[in-house]
């Protein structure tokens, strides 16, 4: 009987080893490491061309790390409308600025002058843009329902005078209405989009011939904003409905916050964003409120009403250390909020925004805040610590840009707008 059990265990272990070897070979092959893949396949007697989904090994490792880290997270009550697997992934803490300290006026930093170049055009208004987490790609979405994907190194080559460079590497067509927002999967070559057709669509940009989505989530409302959880297993959707929708990427299930107030909430959501670890997420709403949610329980843990007077909040993003939130509103102000206390710690003034749903963003080091001045059609920059305005540059768009997006890893950003153009900004030589 014991020998039978040992044999069964040996067979099970052998099967796991074969699966692991197949995943390793497929991973190496998909990343163009053909010689290494061939050597491993030969040494382990694994078929070189075994069929395994791309990035399957990465996905399994990510799930394993998430499960390991979940042991340190507090549990979720059974009354909460979330699967037990949902939680945050711990990432290394990023060196950050303590914005709660008052910095003297006159001690502001100077941002290097930037220049921009037009890359491409949509057939109509360009409504949104997003960089990949590694800064290697960015995508734009238009009112013409198309999505364009650019490779940043090729953009730089083109700007440097390389006439052979072709930075536009993919164009996707699969929505029936204008695109509202975009996001990249944190670990896979997947780009998602949301649109006025109530859909969230998934595109695999590793496939050169793919023009259509391989997965579609159908919401009940216009999906105005989306954000991937850092694990890639869940995504947030902000819609015309006042309550954020949370989707399980694998099961298509939609979950709602368990304690969302029934009264005092009336506006659509303009933007949703996760923090860097997924431990908290935020909504910026047309009713003028900023709302913070626990990333594990999905409970609303703080609501800042009238954050921008009686004006709608157009954007809200976290600092990398998750201690502060930067918001923009149609009252022409940009504000920095301390999450723990809910108090405003900085206010950035001097740029008019009353018509467009413009964002305020940090640069990659969080030393500067960048936004748009509709009245002067300029890109405006403030020192993030002192709140001094330190630079303003003509946008070079015909009409004020409606979207601005900064690379997470270097000093480059993208603007796009009603003139249909996409402009790439970098430091002047």
Curated annotation (Swiss-Prot):
Chief site of localization: nucleus
GO-annotated cellular components: mRNA cleavage stimulating factor complex
Positions of WD repeats: 121-160, 174-213, 218-257, 264-303, 308-347, 351-392, 396-429
Pfam family, any one: WD40
Biological process per Gene Ontology, one example term: mRNA 3'-end processing
Annotated stretches, region: Hydrophobic: 20-41
Keywords: mRNA processing, Nucleus, Repeat, WD repeat
Subcellular location: Nucleus
InterPro entries: CstF1-like, WD40/YVTN_repeat-like_dom_sf, WD40_repeat_CS, WD40_repeat_dom_sf, WD40_rpt
General function of this protein: One of the multiple factors required for polyadenylation and 3'-end cleavage of pre-mRNAs. May be responsible for the interaction of CSTF with other factors to form a stable complex on the pre-mRNA.
PANTHER family named in the record: CLEAVAGE STIMULATION FACTOR SUBUNIT 1
Record's comment describing the protein's domains: N-terminus mediates homodimerization.
Quaternary organization: Homodimer. Belongs to the CSTF complex. Forms a complex with cleavage and polyadenylation specificity factor (CPSF) subunits CSTF64, PABN3, CPSF30, FIPS5 and CPSF100.
Protein name: Cleavage stimulation factor subunit 50
Species annotation: Arabidopsis thaliana (Mouse-ear cress)
Lineage: Eukaryota, Viridiplantae, Streptophyta, Embryophyta, Tracheophyta
Gene responsible for this protein: CSTF50
């Amino acid at each position: 009987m014991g020998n039978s059990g040992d044999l069964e265990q040996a067979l099970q272990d052998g099967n796991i080893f074969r699966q692991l070897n197949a995943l390793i070979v497929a991973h190496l092959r998909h990343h163009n490491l053909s010689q290494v893949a061939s050597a491993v396949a030969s040494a382990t007697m694994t078929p070189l061309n075994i069929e395994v989904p791309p990035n399957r090994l990465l996905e399994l490792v990510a799930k394993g790390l998430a499960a390991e880290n979940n042991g340190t997270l507090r549990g979720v009550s059974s009354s909460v409308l979330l699967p037990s697997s949902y939680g945050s992934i711990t990432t290394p803490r990023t060196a950050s600025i303590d914005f709660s300290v008052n910095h003297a006026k006159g001690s502001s930093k100077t941002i290097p002058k930037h220049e921009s170049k037009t890359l491409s055009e949509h057939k109509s208004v360009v409504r949104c843009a997003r960089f990949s987490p590694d800064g290697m790609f960015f995508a734009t979405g238009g009112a013409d329902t198309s999505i364009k994907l650019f490779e940043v190194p090729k953009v730089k080559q083109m700007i440097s005078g390389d006439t052979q460079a072709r930075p536009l590497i993919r164009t996707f067509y699969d929505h029936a209405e204008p695109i509202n927002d975009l996001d990249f999967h944190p670990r896979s070559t997947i780009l998602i989009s949301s649109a006025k057709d109530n859909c969230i669509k998934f595109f695999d940009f590793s496939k050169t011939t793919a023009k259509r989505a391989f997965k579609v989530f159908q919401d009940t409302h216009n999906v105005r904003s989306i954000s991937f959880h850092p694990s890639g297993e869940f995504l947030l959707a902000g819609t015309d409905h006042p309550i954020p929708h949370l989707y399980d990427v694998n099961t298509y299930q939609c979950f709602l916050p368990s304690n969302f107030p029934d009264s005092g909430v009336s506006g659509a959501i303009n933007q949703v964003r996760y923090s860097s670890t997924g431990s908290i997420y935020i909504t910026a709403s047309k009713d003028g409120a900023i709302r913070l949610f626990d990333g594990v329980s999905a409970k609303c843990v703080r609501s800042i009403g009238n954050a921008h007077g009686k004006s709608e909040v157009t954007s809200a993003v976290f600092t990398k250390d998750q201690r502060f939130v930067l918001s923009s509103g149609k009252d022409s102000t940009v504000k920095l909020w301390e999450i723990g206390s809910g108090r405003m710690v900085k206010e950035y003034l001097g740029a008019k925004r009353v018509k467009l749903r413009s964002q305020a963003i940090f640069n990659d080091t969080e030393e500067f805040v960048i936004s748009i001045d509709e009245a002067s059609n300029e890109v405006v920059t403030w020192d993030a610590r002192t709140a001094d305005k330190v630079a303003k540059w003509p946008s070079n768009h015909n009409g004020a840009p409606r979207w601005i997006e900064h690379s997470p890893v270097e000093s480059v950003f993208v603007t796009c707008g009603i003139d249909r153009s996409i402009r790439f900004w970098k430091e002047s030589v």
